């Protein structure tokens, strides 16, 4: 340890004879002392001389002076060091060895060198004799004699040239010895000026007259330690003025020594109980025998009078090295306080300990360890302790009661019982042999003269006022009780001027050793405040400068010489460092029980020991007063095992190969060894303890059985006291519960024995207590006719964790006030949570259920069937699943599957449910409350909320009841009835209220929410379409009205139930443990996680070592995970030695890593050191042999077949159900391949077996064998779906084997896996993985849901990444995330974790995303087989093999082709919604941030496929995309031969492919279906009577080709002028640059209609003027409206357009252009005669005029006229003000107010008519639509004079010899049109040809196309008008 400048140190004594180079057992001790140094004042310059000497030049006496170390610091004003070198044996050049740290070691002996030299040095002193410095060497042999040798100054010759002189400042470090070729440095001999004489005095009158002398131990101990051995403890007592040889007592006692650094300056700490104990334990107790009549003093002796002689041994040494961490004590600084009474001390600032890491070399002789040496160290310095010393002169007041003073409880003269006293540290002495500041001394009780009386911590007896030792009887090692006698009146201790006698302190002796009352407190006694017996705690840790084994022995001290003190003066204390021991805290009782010590706050006593020293010239006096609370034991606490936070105890026995749990005993078993205890904790894992004994006793007049489990080092806290072993009691059998049940197993047993009894719950029960076989249908068999009540004394109780229905059948029974929590039930037949069936007037009231039910047939949240039975004030909350395909009839309901009978009812109840079903027949029903309600059964005052997703279109499905019809009688009078019910359920393929509508339904006051999505996916006209269902909607309420309506219907709220008795959180209470600090409560809780099985005292001890600036002090620790580099370690036994990292995971999911180093095993726990923190860590598992378990279970596990009946029974499914959708078969095989390795991990992470015990291991073997199928299923499931990583950490092992990662320390991984495997087929379906985590894993992990768990893993292991970044780095799917080109949108899309985020992970984990189950399949993709495209409104998924064919083969360019195409597709989708974002208002823009699912078809090609793949793959396809992604997601897409279809929330590509260009156009079509009502149409919805296809094809979707001659808007494809077909383009070149806002859109359409209207006008003029009647008949047709009754809603106000050929009379009327409008004329060129049905796929032709302005006079227009007028309104008024009002229900409320209404599914709705729209849009400007149309034409006619010149390709010239033609005015254009019209008229019936193509067969069409294209190009996509005076 470093010696700081100016520090005075004189050391001349030795501690234990076991310390040395050679063990005392071989009769020799080798000691090497550091030469004492002279006093050096601060900053004084000193001369230092290095003289280099060869060892051959030394005499034998000089060799004995050799110090095997490197000189460290300047100490005196003139120093000479002889640096000794040894000639290398082969004369090779070598580096000087690093003999140790100059900062830490004071003595070093190299084993091999000493063995050769045989040097023996015990102590060195310097004394001036006739102005000559003489070194005195005391050589000590094992027999106790010494030899004194004087050594004079050395001379050197061989290495004279290397001599060097230095001028250095006091306290500076000395230079290192030089490297000398051919020589090796071995040590030094120091020559100095000071003497080693010293004295100790408490108070002095003058330099010549001593008053009282205090005997202090000043000793030096080398840095070696022996193993525990029996040695001779030599102790010496020297009387005053006597040279009498020391008395020696031989004590035989096994012990291990502790190493005290001889050069440290130790200081006493009273920072806290913990700091004090650590500080004081730097030395262990010693034993000393003193003659009762011989007085002890301190005197200056002549060394020749102390000669000891002996013979030395020189054994051969071998060594090895180990690493040890120790604590460093802190220094103490004394400050004068003039306001504090003289002689009084007070702690101003508490000290803090440092730490040291040492590499220790262990020497052995004949394979037995004899000593240890410290090779290297690293040190963290401690912080000092500051003590105030009073200087105020005060008058001592004796016998004054109730005085508020510094020192309380003990006063001078008080009788104090002795107690165990820790040893004093070594003293630092001056150059005159006088002690400096005394470290580690407790304050002593002083007399009224300020002199010490009782000195509790001194190794020798207290001396009398004459300076002579009191006579003290010899004291043996303390083993008994000590009770404290507290003084009544505390007094303040002061010091007066002048010499005074010290009052003698009478001391009451201990019971074992009588002591004269006049004697002072002696070694082995202390002031003790504990009431209980105590014994020293084991010291199991190492201290700085020492190595201690567990049973620390005592160290004897040799007294030092002293000489009379001189005048006293004050001197500041010098800096120094000291070492703190690791252990501190509690003491232990006789049986090893840890006893908490009093805390600081409970002690009012200060004891002061004062030590005065002065130097030889009398100029400086050092006075030390250290403070210690004598009520506190400061020994290290004994480290033991303790099972804390025990929540439950289970006793098991093995009999005839069967294990049985006992909740009571009949008698004392004869074979307790066949029993074991499972100790369950609320915080830690289960621990198995072997039973040692079972005995009978009585308590409270009851016969009880005491079960005792014994384990090494295990103690149990009972009533705040610790006792060995672990005990608890069981009742005598016969006291079974009869009415009030607190055990589920007892309840089940009792009811099964008496099915008609009355039963009350007395607590919440856990169904896990009862294990069911796979054949059991329920817990209680038979028919229950009694009563079960779940409430007692106003408390509501629940049954948790049902895995099957509670009852099989109920008949006339009553069940009330009962809650069923966390049910997870699956079955092959009809199932319900409470019972399968209730009959005969069963009453169910206030029964509340939450959980999940899955079955193959009927399912009810409470009951599968209620026949003539009632349910009232009850509820269900959870999920119900039946997705099996079967032809059997079944009924599914949120509360009841089938409610039947006149007396059957549901009243004042509710269901909050998510139902997944696959009904495909009319006798399969699904309802939010009940599936089938028949035979006069009724539901009233009830409601349902949630979602019903029925895959197929058929079946009876609805939000309240699936069907009310009585199928048995077929009589409407006996149908079920609904009264005052509400549906707040989203329904797919069903209705809102009932699933089947018929005349005469018995329904009244039914309500539904407008906000609900209620729709059916149907096939219409060979197209799959999604249609909203208005059938059976009842009264539709706004979302804002729903909550109040529910409250009006009923106010049912499930009660708050009592938690499980074992689920209550029980935290350890550390507050009563010694050294507890309230501000460290969190730290103790954290350390408890690091040391889960250690006793509280040990936890407090290490908790007090945690620095306040550390994270461990500031944050709550959730878990600690061992790692080997970056890999998580689970198999602790196999990796015990190789673990090198510890990850600490905190509650905020931050983490930090520490280096981890294995130290040793303690009580079958592997113990590790954590970095340089001084803390320990033990894994949450005991070490035991697992091979026997693995070897016995492995064969049976390997025999399990995945497709076996046993596996199906475990899954709970019928033989015909395929296992395909589990997607586990391949993984099941892989799991079995490495079972042995997995079982090691599993057993290492499961329950703790504290010892190898066949009964306990057999229990585990039996459990695994009985559940082998479930275990393998659970393991396979987690290995399949959690095999992904965070950086280098694979999460699979964390999920499987570290369920405590999030702080749930009491989870059993084995039980979790078994429970998962037994959770049922539905729960293990791959598609249910999100729910499976929530149901089967979250509660075991201490988490809530899958996605927060994944995020928290990421925060721990990849804190610098986002969730999405991690996800993309982990998945093998090819992900394209395309942000908008609009800056404000792009910014929002970068907001991680928001609804705006473009990140795939953020979107698929959104609560609104239907397929959140995609995450795990994407994370575990084994290969790149799937692509994902994310844009603002959609999220697309497809397979690479969808594009695989001969052209793009898997081993060719398939991957690059797909990935390039994916990027192009993403850009198109981005551009499309950038277009929409620009033209919508803010409300509409916000709604674009959504997730519409896009799916490519399940059509996968091969390398031999021609063109597009057409074969549809099913879920058992081996294709990797299907097997690893689409199948596990479970979206059963219905395939057809069409291009694509939409369902409202998804788009499915069929014939078209997502990544093709036609797929882009399809995208605009299908996304219109998903967007029109709520977004494009401003939220007003589609106009009544207009079908979904009206809005897509021909209106809002993009044109199929850029050459399409249709009135449409290209919103998605970018074209280029360099395209080969640019000359044919008629659509916008680039929508991203053309449309910047809605104004741009209107301008484009308006300017386009300038051309359209002009050309139509010219063509119309030509027809009416140039053609005869018959030619007009051929060129034109007429359009009319037809009103048919709508088959869905029964209304006849929706127009259907019919195109007819003209009659001759009609043709004759066409004499002017206006007559074309007035007679509803349109061109025959591209509009064939026929009916244009509503909701059709029609487009408005760009060059075939519709002159008509036909409106829907009764209501809604037809599909042709509606599209044409919509575009004309867009041109005239814009999108928001023109098109949207026309095609939406924007004016519905206006219509309603005007009395224009229709009835939609029984509800009155406003009917928006064309007349109303015209009036509203144009504010009454036009009276008719014909007037509007005429005005539009006239607007262009008025501009004809301003027509711009245009040059176009002459269509009359044949290709490729096209010429150009230029027109300058309309007249020229009219002439060309006349010619073209006449040319077409000359062709015979060309419009009627089947193969007619206007592009090639019509001159008019070709002319109009050429003109349009020319103006399109000339105006740059109609950015400008074709008229001069318009923009």
Curated annotation (Swiss-Prot):
One of its GO terms (molecular function) is zinc ion binding. It is found in: Secreted, Cell wall; Membrane. It catalyses: Cleavage of Pro-|-Thr bond in the hinge region of the heavy chain of human IgA. InterPro entries: G5_dom, GLUG, LPXTG_anchor, Peptidase_M26_C_dom, Peptidase_M26_N_dom, YSIRK_signal_dom. The active site is at 1566. The Gram-positive cell-wall anchor motif LPXTG is located in the N-terminal part, in contrast to such motifs in other known streptococcal and staphylococcal proteins. The protease could be cleaved by the sortase and anchored in the membrane via the two potential N-terminal transmembrane domains, whereas the propeptide located prior to the LPXTG motif would remain attached to the cell wall peptidoglycan by an amide bond. PROSITE patterns: G5, GRAM_POS_ANCHORING, ZINC_PROTEASE. Residues 235-246, 516-529, 538-559, 568-606 have a biased composition (Polar residues). Its EC number is 3.4.24.13. It is a multi-pass membrane protein; Peptidoglycan-anchor. Residues 1-42 form the signal peptide. Residues 276-296, 485-511, 620-640 have a biased composition (Basic and acidic residues). Zinc metalloproteinase which cleaves human immunoglobulin A1 (IgA1) in the hinge region, rendering it less efficient in coating the surface of colonizing or invading pneumococci. May be responsible for pneumococcal infection and is potentially involved in distinct stages of pneumococcal disease. This is Immunoglobulin A1 protease. The lineage of its organism: Bacteria, Bacillati, Bacillota, Bacilli, Lactobacillales.
């Amino acid at each position: 340890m470093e010696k700081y400048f100016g520090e005075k140190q004189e050391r001349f004594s030795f501690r234990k004879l076991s310390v040395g180079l050679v063990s005392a057992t071989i009769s020799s001790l080798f000691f090497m002392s550091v030469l004492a140094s002279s006093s050096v004042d601060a900053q004084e310059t000193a001369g230092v001389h290095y003289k280099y000497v060869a060892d051959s030049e030394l005499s034998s006496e000089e060799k004995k002076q050799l110090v095997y170390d490197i000189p460290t610091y300047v100490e005196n004003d003139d120093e000479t060091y002889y640096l000794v070198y040894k000639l290398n044996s082969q004369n090779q050049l070598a580096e000087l060895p690093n003999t140790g740290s100059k900062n830490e070691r004071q003595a070093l002996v190299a084993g091999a060198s000493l063995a050769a030299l045989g040097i023996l040095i015990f102590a060195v002193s310097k004394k001036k004799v006739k102005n000559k410095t003489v070194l005195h060497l005391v050589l000590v042999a094992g027999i106790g004699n010494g030899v004194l040798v004087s050594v004079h100054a050395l001379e050197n010759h061989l290495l004279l040239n290397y001599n060097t002189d230095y001028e250095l400042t006091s306290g500076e470090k000395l230079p290192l010895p030089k490297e000398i070729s051919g020589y090796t440095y071995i040590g030094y001999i120091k020559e100095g000026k000071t003497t080693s004489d010293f004295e100790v005095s408490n108070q002095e009158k003058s330099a010549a007259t001593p008053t009282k002398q205090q005997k202090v131990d000043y000793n030096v101990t080398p840095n070696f330690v022996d193993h525990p051995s029996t040695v001779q403890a030599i102790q010496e007592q020297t009387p005053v003025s006597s040279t009498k040889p020391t008395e020696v007592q031989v004590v035989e006692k096994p012990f291990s020594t502790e190493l005290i650094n001889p050069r440290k300056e130790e200081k006493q700490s009273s920072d806290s109980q913990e700091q004090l104990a650590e500080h004081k334990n730097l030395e262990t107790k010693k034993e000393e025998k003193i003659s009762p009549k011989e007085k002890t003093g301190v005197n200056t002796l002549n060394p020749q009078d102390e000669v000891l002689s002996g013979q030395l041994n020189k054994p051969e040494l071998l060594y090895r090295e180990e690493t040890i961490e120790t604590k460093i004590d802190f220094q103490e600084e004394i400050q004068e306080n003039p306001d504090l009474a003289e002689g009084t001390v007070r702690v101003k600032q508490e000290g803090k300990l440092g730490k040291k890491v040492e590499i220790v070399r262990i020497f052995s002789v004949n394979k037995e360890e004899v000593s240890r040496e410290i090779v290297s160290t690293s040190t963290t310095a401690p912080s000092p302790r500051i003590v105030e010393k009073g200087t105020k002169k005060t008058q001592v007041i004796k016998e004054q009661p109730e005085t508020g003073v510094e020192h309380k409880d003990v006063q001078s003269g008080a009788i104090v019982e002795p107690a165990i006293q820790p040893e004093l540290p070594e003293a630092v002495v001056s150059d005159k042999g006088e002690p400096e500041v005394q470290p580690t001394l407790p304050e002593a009780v002083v007399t009224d003269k300020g002199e010490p009386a009782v000195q509790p911590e001194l190794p020798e007896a207290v001396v009398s006022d004459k300076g002579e030792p009191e006579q003290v009887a010899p004291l043996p090692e303390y083993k008994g009780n000590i009770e404290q006698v507290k003084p009544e009146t505390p007094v303040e201790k002061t010091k007066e001027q002048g010499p005074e006698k010290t009052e003698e302190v009478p001391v009451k002796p201990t019971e074992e050793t009588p002591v004269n009352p006049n004697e002072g407190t002696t070694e082995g006694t202390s002031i003790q405040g504990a009431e209980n017996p105590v014994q020293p705690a084991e010291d199991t840790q190492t201290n700085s400068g020492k190595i201690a084994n567990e049973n620390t022995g005592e160290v004897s001290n040799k007294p030092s010489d002293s000489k009379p003190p001189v005048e006293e003066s004050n001197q500041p204390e010098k800096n120094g460092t000291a070492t703190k021991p690791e252990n501190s805290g509690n003491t232990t009782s006789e049986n090893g029980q840890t006893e908490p010590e009093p805390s600081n706050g409970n002690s009012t006593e200060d004891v002061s020991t004062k030590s005065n020293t002065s130097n030889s010239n009398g100029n400086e006096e050092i006075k030390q007063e250290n403070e210690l609370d004598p009520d506190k034991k400061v020994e290290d606490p004994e480290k033991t095992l303790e099972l804390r936070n025990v929540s439950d105890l289970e006793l098991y026995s093995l009999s005839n190969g069967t294990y049985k749990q006992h909740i009571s005993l009949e008698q004392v078993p004869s074979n307790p060894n066949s029993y074991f205890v499972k100790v369950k904790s609320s915080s830690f894992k289960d621990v198995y303890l072997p039973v040692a004994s079972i005995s009978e006793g009585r308590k409270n007049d009851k016969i009880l059985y005491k079960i005792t489990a014994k384990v090494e080092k295990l103690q149990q806290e009972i009533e705040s006291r610790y006792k060995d072993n672990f005990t608890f009691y069981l009742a005598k059998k016969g006291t079974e519960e009869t009415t009030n049940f607190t055990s589920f197993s007892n309840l089940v047993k009792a009811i099964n024995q008496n099915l008609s009894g009355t039963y009350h719950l007395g607590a919440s029960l856990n169904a896990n207590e009862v294990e069911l076989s796979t054949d059991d249908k329920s817990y209680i068999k038979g028919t229950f006719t009694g009563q079960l009540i779940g409430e007692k004394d106003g408390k509501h109780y629940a049954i948790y964790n049902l895995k099957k229905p509670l009852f099989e059948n109920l008949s006339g029974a009553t069940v009330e006030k009962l809650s069923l929590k966390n049910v997870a039930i699956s079955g092959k037949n009809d199932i319900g949570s409470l019972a399968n069936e209730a009959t005969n007037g069963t009453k169910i009231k206030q029964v509340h259920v939450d959980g999940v039910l899955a079955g193959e047939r009927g399912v009810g949240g409470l009951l599968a069937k209620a026949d003539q039975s009632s349910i009232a004030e009850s509820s269900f909350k959870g999920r119900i699943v039946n997705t099996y395909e079967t032809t059997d009839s079944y009924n599914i309901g949120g509360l009841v599957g089938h409610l039947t009978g006149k007396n059957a009812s549901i009243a004042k109840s509710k269901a909050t449910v998510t139902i997944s079903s696959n009904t495909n027949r009319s006798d399969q029903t699904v309802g939010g409350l009940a599936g089938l309600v028949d035979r006069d059964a009724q539901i009233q005052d009830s409601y349902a909320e949630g979602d019903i997703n029925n895959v197929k279109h058929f079946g009876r499905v609805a939000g309240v009841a699936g069907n009310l019809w009585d199928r048995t009688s077929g009589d409407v009078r006996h149908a079920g009835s609904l009264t005052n019910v509400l549906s707040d359920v989203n329904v797919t393929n069903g209705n809102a209220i009932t699933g089947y509508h018929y005349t005469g339904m018995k329904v009244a006051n039914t309500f539904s929410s407008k906000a609900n999505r209620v729709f059916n996916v149907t096939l219409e006209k060979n197209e799959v379409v999604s249609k909203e269902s208005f059938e059976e909607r009842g009264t539709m309420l706004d979302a804002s009205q729903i909550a109040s309506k529910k409250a009006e219907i009923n106010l049912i709220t499930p009660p708050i139930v009592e938690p499980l008795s074992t689920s209550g959180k029980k935290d350890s209470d550390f507050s009563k443990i010694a050294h507890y600090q309230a501000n460290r409560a969190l730290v103790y809780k954290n350390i408890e996680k690091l040391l889960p099985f250690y006793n509280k005292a040990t936890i407090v001890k290490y908790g007090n070592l945690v620095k306040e600036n550390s994270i461990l002090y500031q944050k709550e620790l959730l878990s600690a995970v061992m790692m080997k580099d970056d890999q998580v370690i689970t198999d602790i036994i196999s990796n015990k030695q190789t673990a090198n990292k510890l990850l600490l995971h905190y509650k905020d999911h931050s983490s930090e890593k520490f280096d981890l180093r294995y130290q040793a095993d303690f009580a079958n726990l592997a113990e590790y050191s954590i970095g340089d923190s001084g803390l320990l860590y033990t894994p949450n598992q005991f070490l035991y042999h697992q091979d026997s378990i693995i070897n016995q279970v492995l064969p049976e596990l390997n025999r399990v077949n995945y497709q076996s009946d046993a596996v199906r029974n475990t899954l709970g499914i019928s033989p015909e159900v395929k296992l395909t959708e589990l997607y586990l078969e391949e993984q099941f095989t892989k799991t079995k391949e490495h079972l042995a390795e997995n079982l090691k991990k599993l057993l290492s992470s499961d329950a703790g077996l504290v010892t190898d015990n066949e009964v306990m291991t057999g229990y585990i073997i039996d459990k695994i064998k009985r559940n082998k199928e479930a275990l393998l299923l659970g393991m396979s499931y987690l290995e399949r779906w959690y095999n992904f990583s965070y950086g280098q950490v694979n999460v699979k092992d964390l999920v499987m084997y570290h369920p405590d990662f999030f702080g749930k320390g009491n989870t059993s991984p084995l039980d979790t896996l078994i429970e998962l495997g037994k959770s049922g087929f539905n729960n293990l379906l791959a598609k249910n993985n999100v729910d499976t985590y929530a149901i089967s894993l979250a509660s075991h992990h201490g988490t809530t849901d899958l996605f927060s768990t994944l995020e928290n893993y990421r925060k721990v292991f990849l804190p610098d990444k986002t969730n999405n970044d991690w996800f993309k780095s982990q998945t093998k799917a090819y992900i394209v995330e395309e942000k908008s080109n609009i800056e404000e949108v792009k910014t929002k899309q970068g907001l991680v974790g928001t609804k705006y985020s473009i990140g795939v992970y953020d979107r698929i984990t959104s609560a609104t995303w239907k397929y959140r189950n995609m995450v795990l399949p994407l994370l575990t993709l084994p290969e790149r087989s799937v692509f994902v495209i994310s844009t603002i409104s959609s999220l697309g998924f497809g397979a690479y093999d969808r594009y695989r064919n001969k052209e793009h083969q898997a081993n060719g360019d398939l991957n690059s082709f797909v990935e390039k195409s994916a990027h192009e597709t993403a850009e198109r989708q981005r551009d499309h919604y950038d277009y929409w974002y620009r033209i919508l208002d803010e409300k509409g823009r916000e709604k674009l941030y959504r997730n519409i699912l896009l799916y490519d078809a399940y059509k996968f090609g091969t390398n031999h496929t021609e063109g597009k793949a057409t074969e549809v793959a099913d879920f058992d396809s081996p294709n990797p995309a299907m097997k690893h992604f689409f199948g596990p997601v479970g979206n059963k897409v219905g395939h057809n031969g069409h291009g694509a279809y939409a369902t409202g929330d998804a788009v499915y590509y069929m014939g078209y492919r997502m990544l093709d260009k036609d797929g882009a156009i399809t995208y605009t079509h299908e996304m219109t279906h998903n967007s029109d009502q709520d977004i494009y149409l401003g939220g007003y919805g589609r106009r009544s009577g207009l079908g979904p296809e009206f809005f897509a094809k021909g209106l809002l979707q993009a044109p199929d080709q850029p050459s399409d001659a249709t009135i449409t808007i290209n919103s998605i494809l970018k074209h280029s002028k360099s395209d080969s077909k640019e000359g044919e383009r008629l659509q916008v070149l680039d929508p991203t640059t053309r449309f910047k806002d809605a104004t741009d859109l209107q301008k484009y359409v308006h300017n386009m209609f300038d051309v359209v209207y002009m050309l139509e006008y010219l063509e119309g003029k030509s027809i009416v003027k140039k053609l005869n009647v018959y030619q007009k008949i051929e060129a034109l047709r007429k359009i009319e409206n037809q009103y048919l009754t709508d088959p869905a809603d029964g209304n006849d106000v929706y127009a259907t357009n019919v195109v007819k050929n003209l009659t001759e009379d009609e043709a004759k009327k066409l004499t002017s252009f206006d007559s074309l409008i007035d007679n509803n004329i349109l061109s025959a060129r591209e509009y064939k005669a026929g009916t244009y049905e509503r909701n059709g796929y029609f487009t408005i032709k760009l060059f075939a005029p519709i002159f008509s302005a036909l409106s829907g006079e009764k209501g809604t227009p037809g599909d042709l006229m509606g599209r044409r007028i919509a575009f004309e309104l867009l041109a005239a008024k814009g999108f928001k003000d023109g098109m949207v009002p026309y095609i939406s229900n924007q004016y519905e409320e206006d219509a309603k107010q005007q009395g224009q209404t229709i009835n939609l599914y029984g509800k009155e709705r406003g009917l928006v008519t064309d007349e109303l729209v015209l009036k509203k849009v144009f504010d009454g400007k036009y009276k008719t639509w014909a007037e509007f149309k005429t005005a539009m034409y006239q607007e262009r006619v008025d501009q004809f004079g301003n027509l711009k010149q245009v040059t176009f390709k002459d269509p009359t010239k044949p290709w490729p010899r096209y010429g150009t033609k230029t027109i300058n005015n309309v007249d020229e254009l009219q002439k060309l049109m006349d010619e073209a019209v006449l040319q077409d008229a000359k062709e015979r019936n060309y419009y009627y040809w089947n193969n007619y193509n206007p592009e090639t067969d019509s001159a008019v069409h070709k002319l109009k196309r050429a003109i349009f294209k020319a103006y399109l190009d000339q105006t740059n996509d109609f950015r400008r008008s074709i008229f001069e005076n318009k923009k």
